[in-house]
Amino acid sequence: MAKAKFERSKPHVNIGTIGHVDHGKTTLTAAITTVLAKAGGAEARGYDQIDAAPEERERGITISTAHVEYETETRHYAHVDCPGHADYVKNMITGAAQMDGGILVVSAADGPMPQTREHILLSRQVGVPYIVVFLNKCDMVDDEELLELVEMEVRDLLSEYGFPGDDIPVIKGSALKALQGEAEWEEKIIELMTEVDAYIPTPERETDKPFLMPIEDVFSITGRGTVATGRVERGIVKVGDVVEIIGLAEENATTTVTGVEMFRKLLDQAQAGDNIGALLRGVAREDIQRGQVLAKTGSVKAHAKFKAEVFVLSKEEGGRHTPFFANYRPQFYFRTTDVTGIIQLPEGTEMVMPGDNIEMTIELIAPIAIEEGTKFSIREGGRTVGYGVVATIVAE
């Protein structure tokens, strides 16, 4: 069969399957591709093809992830499925696989299990905004009341972590039976995807977000002024826009972009993904430095203290060989620069072992432009020893 070309005209959404080991995440992923393939919206992928996910070395960490793509009537999806629990932790904290929404798979025969809870918590911490539930293995449960109990348990668990548990769509099905081609269960997969289409909103495009550019380098051009270079992370910047210079300083400075240059050509505007030089009015070379960001006025603030979800590299991954304790002072690398910070561990946690993932409070020695969801790495003498994501800002 010739490989059908995916229509790029449909809105694109990134999703993934999450949930406890052996509850059927991979079987469900295979079932979705198989059922949608009948309508011409996917290439059917067998369980074995998905399960044998190649290990990816993403910045020195080994993560196994399966990527599949498929489409419904209205959308194009990229779907990630991870074989192991540790793969989810790494994936979600490093942002290797960005998720606009998740399908939480819970076995109706077993109910919520420890990793069900952990994945819901992780989704909350790293900012997966929407979750749809697939109660799997319903063919193995004859008791309607038992199914309702499991559904209630899952809804309560979601509410406990700040998701709207009462409103979340819950679909009862059997991934295995659907994969085997049984019509009544195939219907449930269609129902699941209809709910995913309706419930998980199309993400805002990067270009529609407020402008932000991390500053990589600064130089002055005689007679013209100071230029800050970097890659636009999000939004659009036009000549004449007023922007703020944020981070590493007591006060934010405000300036006007008087020129935008890319590949030595002058542009009227630049957008997310472009590598540019921005000419800034009235800014002295020494007033601006790498590690600061240029951003739309009022869109982001500099903070020094925050709570973060952190994954500490194991010795095998090139991380530390020994644990660290409270008041550990490594460097935190945000976008383009390292800033020293002090770690506070949660109550009752004495130390953190290589390979752990943990929530901690971090206080930087200088404020940096951050918001919930900002990713960073933890370094010691230029060597990466961990990755993290800002979960909440701590008011100072």
UniProtKB/Swiss-Prot annotation:
It catalyses: GTP + H2O = GDP + phosphate + H(+). Residues 60-64 are annotated as: G2. SUPFAM superfamilies: EF-Tu/eEF-1alpha/eIF2-gamma C-terminal domain (SSF50465), P-loop containing nucleoside triphosphate hydrolases (SSF52540), Translation proteins (SSF50447). Residues 136-139 are annotated as: G4. Its EC number is 3.6.5.3. It is found in: Cytoplasm. One of its GO terms (cellular component) is cytosol. Residues 174-176 are annotated as: G5. Mg(2+) binds at residue 26. GTP hydrolase that promotes the GTP-dependent binding of aminoacyl-tRNA to the A-site of ribosomes during protein biosynthesis. PANTHER family: ELONGATION FACTOR TU, MITOCHONDRIAL, ELONGATION FACTOR TU-RELATED. This is Elongation factor Tu. It comes from Bacillus mycoides (strain KBAB4) (Bacillus weihenstephanensis). The lineage of its organism: Bacteria, Bacillati, Bacillota, Bacilli, Bacillales.
